Amino acid sequence: MDAAKRLELCKEIQENEIEALKAIFMDDFEELKVRNAWNVTNGHVYCIHLCSRSANSKSIAKLDLCIELGRSYPYVKPVIKLQNGENVLNSQIRFLLDKLDTKAKDLLGEEMIFELASIVQDYLNDWQSDLSSQFASLEEERAVQLKHDRERAEVDLQLRLKREKDALFEEEQTLQNKIQDELQRRSYETPQSSSKKKTNSKETTSLETLPTSIYFDCSISVRDCHDSLVTFNRVLPLYTISHSNLSTLTLVKPESKEISLQDCVFLLRTVRISTPYWSTEDGKREIQELEYELESLKVIRHDLLASIYEYQLERETRGYGWRLYVLQEYSPKFTLFSLLQTVLTLDVETVRAFSNNILEGLAELHRLGISHKSLHLDNVVLFHSGHRTFAKLMDFGFTRTLRDMNASHPFNINSQSITNILPEGLYPPEVSESSFAAASRKTDIWCFGLLVLQMLCGAHVLNKFSSLKLIMTHVIPLLPGSYQDLVRRCLMRDSRKRPSAIDLLSSHVIRLGTAVLPPVEQGTFSKSARPSYGGQQDGIIDLLYRKSVSRYETDFEELEFLGRGGFGEVVKVKNRIDGRFYAVKKLVLLSDDKENSRILREVMTLSRLHHEHVVRYYTAWVETEANDTVTEIISSDSESLSQSLNMAVDFRQSSSLPADKLSSLDIHFEDDYNSSADEEDPEASDISFQYSNTSDKEGSSDKDSSIEEASSVKTQENGLNATLYIQMEYCEKLSLQDIIRDKIPVDEMWRLFRQILEALAYIHSRGMMHRDLKPGNIFLDENRNVKLGDFGLATENENYQDNNDKWKNRQSADEDLTTGVGTALYVAPELLSRRNGVRYDAKVDMYSLGIILFEMCMTFSTSMERIRIIDTIRSPSISFPSTFPFSRASHEFKVIHCLLQHDPTKRPSSQELLESEAIPPKVGEEFIQEGLRLLSNPNTPYYLKLLKVLFGQVPDRHKDFTYDFNLSEESGVLSKVSDRGWDSLLACLVRDHVVKVFRRHGAKERESHILFPKSSQYDKDQASVSLLDKNGTLLQLPYDTVLPYARNVARNAVEEEKTYLISDVFREAKGGGRPKAIKEISFDITTNSDNLDWYDAETIKALDEVLTEIPSLTESCILINHADILSSILDYLQVSKDKRRMATHILGQINQRLTLSQVRNQLRIESLVPSTTLDDLSLFDFRENYEEGASKLRKIFGKEMPQKMRTALNYMERVVKLLRALKISHQLYFMPLCVYNFEFYDGGLMFQAINLAEKSELICAGGRYDKLVRFFDPPLMRTARKKHVVGICFALEKLVFSMLRYIRFHNSKQSSKHSPSPTLKSVGPWAPRRVDVLVTSIGKDSILEKCSLLQELWALNIQADIVLRGASSLEEIVTHYRSEGINWVLVVRQKNTQMEHSVKARNILKNEDDEIRFDEVGMWLLGEINERKRNESMLQSKRILDSAQQDVAKFVDTSQSNLDVQLISLKDVNDRKYKWKHKQNAMNKVYDLVQSAIRESSEDAIALAVDCDSEAMEKLRSTTTLDEESWKRLIESCPASQREYMQRLQKKLVTLAEQDKKRVWICSFRTNEIYLYGLK
């Protein structure tokens, strides 16, 4: 054919095709006039306007197909363009153009425009299904939201009415209470009897309204009567025992099933804070400080401190304000005030016992850096244990804080007037009522002195003598002698001169009672003035002069004299009971209080020390004996004394309460005390007080009124000798002084020095210092190990306290420590200073240690040389002698030089020196600890040597065998054996679908970074896998994919880049062994551009597409938030910066693992959010669309909204607009508490996806992590252009498990239909398949035939595998391999058989067998696979359609209706050009329209799907099958192209009428109109 004829033929073909296209597409076909470069009109450019077709919604996706035909078309491919797309992504257009271009090449030589248009139409219909389901869900969501808003408005109205009603009721109740209060006030002002007043008091107490129960967020742990730990959360009020203007005290019992708790009673203090100030920021800040104080106090447990078990701060349920609950230990006995109200005064021995308890409690508080601040009679409570009664301190610290807070801003109207605790004249000089917050430990000592006065003279004494001058002049001279000195010392005006609690405990009047007291003269407070309980009492001197058995002589055998000191001797003894050897120090107690205090201070110090290098202390006691003349006089009278009275005093650990600790207390409680009895009635208690120590001569007149002067009367004058026995650990008769004279080997010297240093570090950590450290006080045991002893000058380091407790009172800068000094050669220079106010601390021991080390290094020929050289080195210049055996670079020189610095601040502490490199490593058994220290410091010279040895170990085979021991233990859902085979197959499917989405966005795969230096961004409790390389570098495996990529971006120059990564992240195995690997998929966009909102939006769009791609995630939603918004919320909640990491970790579990209530409790338990703002957390617990969520935030913050929150909201608004333009398929919510890895995404947008079908399971998380990138950006490599990264991370395991549950669900539905292979039929393309085809044989093996067939299948790209051994039956093969997703089994016949040229094919899906010729197997399988793909595509389309119709279907009883949809098309139904998908979509659309109306018909119905416009549908309503004229008018009014179509419709209706059908549904799939057409 020549060129002219060819062109003529092409023109004819084009004209015919254009005419056909105009008939098919009608108005949607348009011829365009396009001018070329030479301004000539090209008349062969056509445009077809295509849109998606949907039966139940408008056309959403639209696209114009523009075709430019060349002269040689169809032999030359036309120019194809896609324009004017609506709701179609650019990526989809590019994809479609590739499809059209490929199809056009395949159809060269044929008419192709209709085929190309059909392809575009098909894809538009597919996209329509996705978009229509999205829009439908949005519309339904809007309807649900509107309904929810209406319901919420109704609830709000009801709540508002209820609040108004409650407010009115409360106002009336308040008025009624005021009326009752006024009546009671008037009744008290009128004269009436005391019994009447008591009755009114009871009525007032009962007026307090008690809640039914109080719930504590934190569990409360207490020990029951069996010393078992039991817990509870709720308490039930029993009775209000006290109601003051400040607080209410209520007896409560725990609500618990524990039998041991049934009789337990606790004290609940309730403080109501209702004035407006406490709702302001300043008020909340003060309340928050109170919480910190209570948090520190509730952990204190001591036998002489009443415990604070728990506290809770709640908002008032009505109105504004707070309610504070403090649960405390309760005593069913008296307070000290109640006791003194009953018995007026106490005898001196009882005062001593109670004073000892009070001082031990104060000493413990002061050791913790806490001042009581509110020590008075009501805060000393009495407890009963066995036959003894002892005193405890309660309400320490926080009650004074409450009073001060109330004084500055009253808690409520009634709390404006609070009674002062002390008279104005008796306040400590350093404070007043308004400034008591500045109270220190010395203020507590002042209050203790007043307590002693009240115990000795009665509670009223401070009211009668209301100034210090009156007390000093008229009261103190009448006290017993030693108590005069005690009270005077406590009431020193200069707080620096007051003793500490430890000093007072060491005084003989407290520790020894009246054992060494002289008799005193009778004063004003005489025996006759006291109430008598239990008969006539004997005097103190009578009690002391009775005969007793010596404990020392009874229990010990004295073996050897060890040494003698100024006040006594030390002997070696053998215990007659256990047979062990001990050292006993015997000290004669003199009348000098100061010397006795020094002796007792050593005992007190030893009692609190327990260390391997400190001399162990066991016990101490005092024994007294009289001179012969006195004994003889008293022996006759002593018969009347109680024979059970024992004067031995046991000084054990001060923090415990031994059985015989309070042996001198003579208060006996008879039977059980009824706690509900009236405490003001003396007759209500059965208590007898025996004043066994009362003397007829209790007081002494002191001629000298000076406070500082203490009376002293010698014991010898009264014929009384007192000896203190101290039982200690026995050390061999050897000290460092004995061996230091000889040359000590260097290794031995350092060993001894380290032990001394460890002992010092221990006593310094206990808040004490030795102050008399010298070789003679450093003893050596039989193994030549150090034992530090002789604590005669040791003292409490009153500077020691917890620096972390900011609320605790700091020690006054003017407080003095003891001024005693040790041996002159070893004592620190600051101790020798005579200047007043010179302060020192534990560094004085370090100076002494330096002298000792110097002496250990040197060898002296004479004592004078020793003194001269040590005196020289003690100079400020630290002049070492020329004979010093070590160089200046040696450890010895450096340590001594730093220890002998005259400036204490330049000396190291004991712990610092112990941890420094200056101390040579230990040897022998102690090397392990030293090795750990060296490994932790890479700068030591031994570090690399240790690593070399560490990495040079010989591998252990047993560790190799057990390394993977726990690897098979799965933590996920997979439990069946068959599921485990599915894991990898399904994971590959899921991974491929996710990667397809990422590649659609132009992402390329990047390399993973498997090992990098350990990062500080992870918490210690996170199970990251840490490793150590041979160079000692600490490394880690990836814990996630975010941090390694951020580190890589920071270190490399990166332009705009989209990447994805599929990599393992690792978790440390709990029991050791191989780390657990978790597959993670991430998608990240890196850029230097400033269009951050677009990249954030694109990342979220990619997330949305992944959720759409995986069918198990269709019921998911996307949550967005901004880190700056969450940070502003944490500021609003007053969460401190150091607690935000843990707080955000807990907040991230809201509505996933934990409810809001559980999150609140967790935050409360961890003390992360103050109670004053914890209730405000609910304000931000919402999940709304962006506009509503932003509006809520603006209402909450108002004009005080932080600027960074405003900026973040504006940024989020831009991102949301872009997402709506991108038309994401899933619901987008704004959730202010949405957070995951806050430290990573700080300063940027954060987003998550959660699966609502799986209890809000977190699917993935992501956000912008620019700050993390900057964290890893090396300072020297930073550029002006910032690097921005945003990304998302999926845990592949979660996606696989989600799909697995989805498959199981569909399997369970399909199994009821008895499908032969429900697994594959129900899930379609998501069925995991290892291969499609399995080649096998029956009986004798035919390996060569199988190989030939297998090679042919592989050549056709068919996935196939072989079973090498022949099977016994085909059913055996099918059963064995069905779980692997195989569809076809091919059975190869053996040679020389009748069927050797054919193959038996079993279709497992259909359970059908076919015989296929051997040479046709490949093509047959290709056809079968293509058919399966079409069926799976149909199944997937039907599932999407069913999902969109589920809301309609639930209202229609489809089981009772049989709808037959028949299509009337423009062309013959069997015409191949009218594709099946067109027919199916049209019929499905009509089916949906009929569903909403099918309820009106109870009979089977027929629906006709027609392609008519609205005008034609309207005219159809006026026609009937019996009226031919109406049809003629209808047909004539239609366009020529539609008339034939309408005639065919008429014939169809007549045919149905002849079949006796009554009615038919006529549905237009063009206009979505439906009409029930009557046929009769």
Swiss-Prot record:
Residues 695-706 have a biased composition (Basic and acidic residues). It is found in: Cytoplasm. InterPro entries: aa-tRNA-synth_II/BPL/LPL, Anticodon-bd_dom_sf, CC_SR_Kinase, Gcn2, HisRS-like_core, HisRS-related_dom, Kinase-like_dom_sf, Prot_kinase_dom. Residues 16-127 form the RWD domain. Its main location: cytoplasm. SMART domains: RWD, S_TKc. The integrated stress response (ISR) is activated in response to conditions that promote ribosome collisions: gcn1, which acts as a ribosome collision sensor, activates gcn2. The RQC pathway and the integrated stress response (ISR) antagonize each other: hel2 prevents the activation of gcn2, while gcn2 suppresses RQC activation. Ribosome stalling-induced integrated stress response prefers ribosomes with empty A sites. The kinase activity is stimulated upon binding to uncharged tRNAs. Coiled coil: none annotated. GO terms for biological process: cellular response to amino acid starvation; G1 to G0 transition; GCN2-mediated signaling; mitotic G1 DNA damage checkpoint signaling; negative regulation of cytoplasmic translational initiation; negative regulation of cytoplasmic translational initiation in response to stress; negative regulation of TORC1 signaling; negative regulation of translational initiation in response to stress. Keywords: Activator, ATP-binding, Cytoplasm, Kinase, Nucleotide-binding, Repeat, RNA-binding, Serine/threonine-protein kinase, Stress response, Transferase, Translation regulation, tRNA-binding. It catalyses: L-seryl-[protein] + ATP = O-phospho-L-seryl-[protein] + ADP + H(+); L-threonyl-[protein] + ATP = O-phospho-L-threonyl-[protein] + ADP + H(+). Residues 235-511, 556-928 form the Protein kinase domain. It comes from the Eukaryota. GO terms for cellular component: cytoplasm; cytosol; nucleus. Disruption phenotype: Decreases translation of transcription factor fil1. Decreases RNA level and translation of genes involved the response to amino acid starvation. Autophosphorylated. PROSITE patterns: PROTEIN_KINASE_ATP (PS00107), PROTEIN_KINASE_DOM (PS50011), PROTEIN_KINASE_ST (PS00108), RWD (PS50908). ATP binds at residues 562-570, 585. Homodimer; homodimerization is important for kinase activation by uncharged tRNAs. Interacts (via N-terminal RWD domain) with gcn1 (via N- and C-terminus); this interaction stimulates gcn2 kinase activity in a gcn20-dependent manner in response to amino acid starvation. This is eIF-2-alpha kinase GCN2. It comes from Schizosaccharomyces pombe (strain 972 / ATCC 24843). The lineage of its organism: Eukaryota, Fungi, Dikarya, Ascomycota, Taphrinomycotina. The gene is gcn2.
